[in-house]
Swiss-Prot record:
Its main location: cytoplasm. GO terms for cellular component: cytoplasm. GO terms for biological process: L-histidine biosynthetic process. It catalyses: 1-(5-phospho-beta-D-ribosyl)-ATP + H2O = 1-(5-phospho-beta-D-ribosyl)-5'-AMP + diphosphate + H(+). The gene is hisE. This is Phosphoribosyl-ATP pyrophosphatase. Pathway: Amino-acid biosynthesis; L-histidine biosynthesis; L-histidine from 5-phospho-alpha-D-ribose 1-diphosphate: step 2/9. Keywords: Amino-acid biosynthesis, ATP-binding, Cytoplasm, Histidine biosynthesis, Hydrolase, Nucleotide-binding. It comes from Leuconostoc mesenteroides subsp. mesenteroides (strain ATCC 8293 / DSM 20343 / BCRC 11652 / CCM 1803 / JCM 6124 / NCDO 523 / NBRC 100496 / NCIMB 8023 / NCTC 12954 / NRRL B-1118 / 37Y). Pfam families: PRA-PH. Signal peptide: none annotated.
């Protein structure tokens, strides 16, 4: 089965933005603008959550939809995959302070340790 990388998906979204094709779904999203794209990202995010509750096949399908819509969003906003990779790289090796957050531990906001 052929595979497509995230980079190829991004490049496809960028190509459609630069060279619209009448009747394509991607072109439709770009024509409708940011609000429509954001709505679709929100819908697809919810569908990923629901898919994860059901089965892996549905999770894979819905995640693919979400990734597509995220690529369209990134292109629309002028954010490159290199921008995302740089951000991810800046997080490498950083210690998470999540264990220190009272809200994560379930502590009440004004409750002091005994």
């Amino acid at each position: 089965m052929p595979q497509q990388t995230i980079e190829e998906l991004y490049e496809q979204a960028l190509e459609r933005k630069q060279n619209p094709q009448t009747g394509s779904y991607t072109d439709y999203l770009y024509q409708k603008g940011l609000d429509k794209i954001l709505k679709k990202v929100g819908e697809e995010s919810t569908e990923v959550i629901l898919g994860a509750k059901n089965n892996n096949e549905e999770l894979i399908y819905e995640t693919s939809d979400l990734l597509f819509h995220l690529m369209v969003l990134l292109v629309e906003k002028g954010v490159s995959l290199d921008d995302i990779k740089d951000e991810l790289g800046s997080r490498l090796g950083k210690k998470s302070l999540l264990h220190e957050r009272a809200d994560w531990r379930g502590d009440k906001k004004n409750e002091k340790d005994s």
